[in-house]
Amino acid sequence: MVGDIATRWKELSGSSKWKDLLDPLDLDLRRYILHYGDMAEVGYLAFNSDRRSKYVGDSCYTKEELFARTGYLKANPFRYEVTKYIYGTSSIRLPECFIIKSLSREAWNKESNWLGYIAVATDEGKKLLGRRGIVVAWRGTIQLYEWANDFDFPLESAVMVFPGANPNDEPRVANGWLSLYTSTDPRSRFDKTSAQEQVQEELKRLLELYKNEDVTITLTGHSLGAVMSILSAADFLHNEWPKITPSLQHSLCVTVFAFGSPQIGDRSFKRLVESLEHLHILRVTNVPDLIPRYPVFRFTDIGEELQINTLKSEYLKRSLNLGHFHNLEAYLHGVAGTQHNQGEFKLEINRDIALVNKGLDALEDKYLVPGHWWVLENKGMVQSDDGTWKLNGDRSKKKQEEEDEKEENNCKFP
């Protein structure tokens, strides 16, 4: 799994725009992409999407147990510490798949959703990675095709995120993306600051902490998470890079691995992003997946592209279900087995095919893997001392709330 990542991390992070590494796909780069894809997948596995739960829209797990409870630790040798959870809200109406709301009158929060996490490599992880890796992993959306068919995101000025941009070439971004990234809710303890501010402040804190080391910032996400990864990376390079010391600028590398990303903005936005010479973006797209083509009009692609085609996989059923082509685990299966553009499918990485069926029923039946096998234990039902069962939210979530409240109180001045 590790390969030569520790010695090739600059090249694998896009220092040469992945020249000669994509076709055919370099083995270490294949491992590298899968590593960050797995970190994006953690966001899906931890997210509470059950509207009957009063904790819907939040992470089921605390920062300390996030990787262990989602299966990341046993499957990956790289070790990280989660330092920050990201929360977001929206000032405009968004589809249910973006901001999920609870049916419970005792909901933890009516307007906020957990959007992902920030993690930093431990000393053990640093040895395998070759440097101190900071990761921003944005959670994707649930059932994204619902909005693709009937929701329109008009373009609007993004100068609030990119002040000082050329007024004659003003970048424009879909208003839904901007709203989720920049909105605040003073009534919420989670969204008093926007997702934008939460991410940028934590990145600045971590860079100060590790300013004397080789550091990378890698942003990753699938679907909506891919959009947020690109937007937040461009934000950081545009606004914070000039404030970084020259020595840190020399060693710092900022990379995005975006899986199945919808389009984000117009050609002016593309020109702004491409002017950020220290930003490296690799978009992974699946040939039969339609989502990377949405929204359709006046939008354009950004970054380098690695194209896969899961239709070539002999492990997968022939299906007309468009969701099968957009699923993140299907993408990672495709990365593990893609050959050069005209080649067939062959697993070059020993990646468990059972992972495909975590949220799908896409594997051929002969592999004897049940469909949709990843579920929260007992679907979140907890047995009381008297033997009765009820959906009372994850106990670890209550623990997290207590820790957050304690931390908030400790930060108050007397």
From Swiss-Prot:
Q: Name one Pfam family in it.
A: Lipase_3
Which ranges are annotated Basic and acidic residues under compositional bias? 392-401
Question: GO MF annotations for this entry?
Answer: phospholipase A1 activity
- Coiled-coil intervals in this record? 191-217, 390-410
Could you say which residues form the signal peptide? none
Top EC class per UniProt? hydrolase
Q: Name one GO cellular component term.
A: cytoplasm
CDD domains on file: Lipase_3 (cd00519)
Cytoplasm as a keyword of this entry, yes or no, is yes
UniProt key word Ubl conjugation? yes
Give GO BP annotations, semicolon-separated: lipid catabolic process
Provide this UniProt record's keywords sorted from A to Z: Coiled coil, Cytoplasm, Hydrolase, Isopeptide bond, Lipid degradation, Lipid metabolism, Ubl conjugation
For the cross-link Glycyl lysine isopeptide (Lys-Gly) (interchain with G-Cter in ubiquitin), what are the residue positions? K19
According to the UniProt record, where is the region Disordered?
Answer: 386-414
Q: Which EC numbers characterise this protein's activity in its record?
A: 3.1.1.-
Q: Where in the cell is it found?
A: Cytoplasm
- Name the residues annotated as catalytic in the UniProt entry: S223, D289, H326
Question: In which domain of life is the source organism classified?
Answer: Eukaryota
- What's this protein's family per the entry? Belongs to the AB hydrolase superfamily. Lipase family.
Function, in words = Acylhydrolase that catalyzes the hydrolysis of phospholipids at the sn-1 position.
Task: Name it.
Answer: Phospholipase A1-IIbeta
Record the organism: Arabidopsis thaliana
